[in-house]
């Protein structure tokens, strides 16, 4: 109902703002009225800004969070994928540096018989975006209409596209407002934003990769676990099977950061090679996707099946098929030189010998953004060729003059700024770290004991 209605029971945004300000629980109808009114343009930015700040300061109950997610979800189209016989499972990461697991997981799970309708995003802040990585593949089209998206799922079992205008329009409006009103960080608003988009895909189950550490948005494990529990419970309230893995982002995942470079590393993993940490996390997440997708009785069986699909080449062939169906050049899989390539390289060396004790992972991500691999402003275009290859991981021995990284660049001033950040991000200590951080810290969800 329009807020200007003269009915004695008319919805009034100011009443909802006051209740949230005073920490009084809102009903589902009140939250729905606010979301619908704002999406239609009946409620102005300044009132919704006030409500968002009240949410940041007062928080939300679990029923309120679920109601907000539901209202945002139903502000647009919810895909009907019931014609697909396979169970529909997606994976979502909260964002990290070098996090290219989606490009491995979609074809890998599809090769196992799970349908993967993946609607992804672009880079945010210091973190890379799945769409930017895919668009490093010449010709790859992420802007497919829903009809074509559904057709690709039937043919290939997986498809990876960007958010369409029809999906969760309330989220697009609310996110743009949060971005300029200091209200991005609320776990309740983050949960509703993520879950409304994911549930609009028409999925049966969802695997969440919630990052924690210096390169994550959630720096502490406590904050990451709170967000994970919130998203799992919200999804379960809406009838979906959801599991969340709290995973480490104190150093970049894999060795390559930058869009075209990360595609190279994805192909390496799908060939059964690539960095150990990236392979390990991909198999862990794939194990969960296959288990929730009903093609593996346990996560362990799902991991074993995934490893066999990689070893046999079936996962790589499914990736090749997806690339070709979405207009990309499939020859990049066997000829990496067909991917965009930077004109210059620069070695990054340390002036101290010892062990790589820790890494400010966010700085590495920011260095890649500075090179042009991400956006410093919303209107910036991304250079797919630039990036960083790390030659050392935390705990490795480092000697003076030995390269710890190579920068791939097209602008020397940007490369020098990036070099300084990479050097500053690496702490060299006299002794090796006492213990190696585990990649998966915790698993949250009703299915968490499915190993």
Question: Each predicted region: which residue ranges?
Answer:
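Acidic, glycine/proline-rich low-complexity segments that act as flexible tails and inter-domain linkers
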Residues: 2-98, 269-270, 318-326, 439, ...
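Well-ordered secondary-structure scaffolds
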Residues: 15, 20, 25-28, 38, ...
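Active-site-proximal beta-alpha loop/turn segments in soluble metabolic enzymes
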Residues: 52-56, 133, 171-180, 209-218, ...
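Alpha-helix C-terminal capping segments
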Residues: 57, 103-117, 197-202, 237-238, ...
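Glycine/serine-rich anion-binding loops at beta->alpha junctions
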Residues: 87-110, 114-126
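Short beta-strand segments
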Residues: 119, 153, 161-164, 194, ...
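A glycine-rich helix N-cap at a beta->alpha junction
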Residues: 133-159, 229-235, 239
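Phosphate/diphosphate-binding glycine-rich loops and adjacent basic-rich segments that engage nucleotide
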Residues: 154-203
């Amino acid at each position: 109902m329009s807020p200007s209605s003269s009915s004695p029971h008319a919805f009034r945004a100011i009443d909802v703002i006051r209740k949230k300000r005073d920490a009084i629980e809102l009903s589902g109808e009140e939250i729905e009225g606010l979301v619908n009114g704002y999406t239609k343009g009946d409620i102005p930015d300044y009132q919704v800004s006030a409500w968002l700040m009240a949410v940041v300061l007062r928080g939300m109950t679990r029923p309120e969070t679920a109601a907000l997610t539901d209202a945002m979800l139903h502000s647009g189209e919810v895909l009907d994928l019931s014609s697909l016989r396979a169970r529909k499972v997606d994976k979502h990461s909260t964002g990290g540096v070098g996090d290219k697991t989606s490009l491995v997981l979609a074809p890998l799970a599809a090769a196992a018989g799970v349908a993967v309708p993946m609607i992804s995003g672009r880079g945010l802040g210091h973190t890379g975006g799945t769409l930017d990585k895919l668009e490093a593949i010449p010709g790859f089209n992420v802007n497919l209409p829903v009809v074509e998206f559904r057709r690709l799922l039937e043919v290939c079992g997986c498809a990876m596209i960007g958010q369409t205008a029809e999906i969760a329009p309330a989220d697009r409006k609310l996110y743009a407002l949060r971005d300029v009103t200091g209200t991005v960080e609320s776990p309740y608003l983050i949960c509703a934003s993520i879950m409304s988009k994911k549930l609009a895909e028409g999925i049966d189950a969802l695997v969440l990769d919630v990052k924690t550490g210096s390169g994550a948005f959630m720096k502490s494990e406590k904050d990451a676990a709170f967000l994970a529990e919130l998203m799992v419970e919200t999804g379960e309230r809406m009838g979906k099977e959801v599991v969340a893995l709290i995973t480490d982002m104190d150093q970049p995942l894999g060795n390559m950061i930058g869009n075209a470079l990360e595609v190279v590393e994805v192909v390496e993993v799908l060939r059964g090679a690539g960095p150990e940490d990236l392979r390990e996390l991909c198999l862990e997440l794939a194990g969960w996707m296959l288990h929730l997708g009903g093609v593996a009785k346990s996560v362990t069986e799902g991991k074993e099946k995934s490893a066999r699909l990689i070893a046999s080449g079936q996962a790589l062939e499914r990736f090749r098929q997806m690339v070709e169906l979405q207009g990309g050049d499939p020859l990049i899989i066997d000829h990496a030189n067909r991917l965009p390539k930077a004109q210059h390289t620069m070695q990054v060396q340390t002036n101290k010998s010892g062990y790589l004790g820790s890494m400010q992972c966010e700085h590495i991500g920011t260095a890649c953004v500075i090179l042009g691999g991400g956006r410093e402003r919303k209107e910036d275009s991304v250079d797919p060729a630039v990036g960083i290859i790390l030659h050392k991981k935390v705990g490795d021995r480092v000697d003076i003059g030995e390269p710890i990284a190579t920068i791939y660049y097209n602008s020397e001033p940007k490369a020098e700024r990036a070099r300084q950040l990479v050097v500053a991000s690496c702490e060299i200590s006299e002794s090796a770290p006492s213990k190696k951080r585990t990649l998966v810290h915790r698993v949250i969800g009703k299915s968490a004991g499915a190993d």
